[in-house]
Amino acid sequence: DDHYDVISAFIKSMRGSDPDATMHYLARMLRAGEDPRFIARRIMIAASEEVGMAAPQILQVTVAAAQAVAMIGMPEARIILAEAALAVATAPKSNASYNAINSALADVDAGLIGQVPLHLRNAPTALMKSWGNHEGYRYAHDWPGAVAPQQYMPDELKGREYYHPNEVKPRLEKIRRILHDEDETQQ
């Protein structure tokens, strides 16, 4: 179905950092009568899933755009959608948050949860304090750089790492060179 093919190409163009293809597919969706709010939601998802921690402010841009689209409507919403989609397409990319939460969820689904360390547990009552809850907790802001040397993961998951950030590289000119070189090799 063309509807799904065009939205797929739109998302993949933002992911692939091609602002021109992003605009092409956005224009096709708008001319086909796609709901601008649907497009705005897809752009917000792309901001989190594709850009993520490489430029976390892009999510704020896309949320503001979605709100503006809902308030303003067409035809001016096209400009707001274009700005938000271009912000995603031209931003540095990282799917590290996406991968991190999926890895953590896979562990939880597999039953790898362990016990919350005693020093991290809540202790609002004398009874809970007598169990050792909260004892030995180090308040992060009392330590240099606000990083307290203590174990946060359950013993069963000690050393487990979920978050693996990417390097952010120079963007648009390099990408355009790569895209043009790739186009030439496919002809």
Question: Model regions: which residues?
Answer:
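Inter-lobe coupling/hinge segments of SF2-like helicase ATPases
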Residues: 1-7, 18
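Terminal-proximal interaction/regulatory segments of ATP-powered molecular machines
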Residues: 16-141, 145-147, 151-187
